[in-house]
Amino acid sequence: MNENDFVVGVLTYITCLREKKRYSTAKSYQDALRSFKCFCGREEIPYAYINRDTLLRYQSWLLAKGCARNTVSTSMRRIRHIYNLAVEVGEAAYIPHLFKNVFTGVESKRKKALPSESLRLLMTSPVTDPQQKRTQSAFCLMFLFSGMAFVDLAHLRKEDIKEGILSYYRQKSGSLIQVEIPAEAQGLLNELAADTTEDSPYLFPFLE
């Protein structure tokens, strides 16, 4: 297999991640590679094959399969990282704004937007009642996790979080979602998870 090949680049990077025991991140790259190879229909993918048109078609392919935009973003960011590494060592050509027209951000899917002041009050108002405090913490986490639905929050399992990455399947569509856990969510996550019984498979206590 040619060294100037995207597949080689990903596999090499996955090996480095595993050596550093970053297994969850390595799996994320493995999933992105498997998906992109399936789309391309080939085992070898020269870096020259990756252009704006290919990326746009890949994005359309993912969306047509029912993938959420945040999942599309994760795949695109994985491809972008490997491509940029190849550019640095001269294995791939530098193409300005190569990923400009594909989604690489984080989308918050709130069907009805709250006024910013109302949102601030919901998230920061002092609460003394334990049940209300739990509800407030859940709301904050749903917001910080890119607008996660409560049913998905309730069904999160303990093994869904590894190395700062949250991976779960949406209850509604079955789509795989992967998001990096923001620093401001960690305290809330630990606080809410502390109420879960040790033998429960779920991360939070809502289904107990």
Segments and roles (model prediction):
Residues 29, 75, 134-137:
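Short, leucine-enriched amphipathic alpha-helices that occur as contiguous helical runs
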